Amino acid sequence: FKADFTRSLGRFGIIISLAIFILCMALGLITGIQLVTVFIFVGIVAGVVYSLSPFRLRQTIYKPLVNVSVGAVPVLIVASFFNIFSFQLLVLVLLIGLSTAANSLWEDLADYESDFTSKARTLVVVLGFKRGFLITVLVGYCLVPLMVLVGILFQLSLLYFIVLGTLIAFLSFRLIQHRNTLFRS
C-alpha cells in the first residue's frame, strides 16, 4: 500500500521533495554558517542514497555505514551552528554514529526473514543470521570503551557509569543465560 501510494504521487512527489530540499538548504543558508549548510546537504544526500534507486543502500551490506551519518550529521549540524568543535565532540559524534550503525544491525536481525525472502543483501543476510548476530554483539561490546571515554571526557556523574555497568552486566547475563538458544548450530 505504502509503495503504491508513493508511486501514485508521481511528479507531485518529486515537487514536494524538491521543495523540502530547497527549504532545508535555505534554512542552512540563513544561518550564515557554511558548515551548517554543508552538513544539511550531506544528510540529505545520505538519505537519498539510502532510500532511492539506483543506490538503495538500505538493502545492501553498506546500510550500517550510511546509518553512521544518520546519527552523526544532526550532531555536526548543531555543533556547526554553535561553532563548537573539540576532541570531546568528535568522540561523541563517533559514538552516536557507530551506535546508529549498530542499531541498524539489530534492525537487520529483526528483518532477517523478509530481507532474505526479498533478496536484500544486508550484512546479516550475506553472513547468515548466526554470524550476523555474533558480529552485532561484538560491535555492541566494542562500543563500551567509547561510551566510557565519552563519560570521562564529558565528566559525567558516577550515575552514568553505574547505569552503563548495570546495562552491560544485564545484557551479558542475558546472553549467557540464553547462550544455548542463541548460539546453537
Language model regions located:
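Multi-pass alpha-helical membrane architecture of UbiA-family
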Residues: 1-185
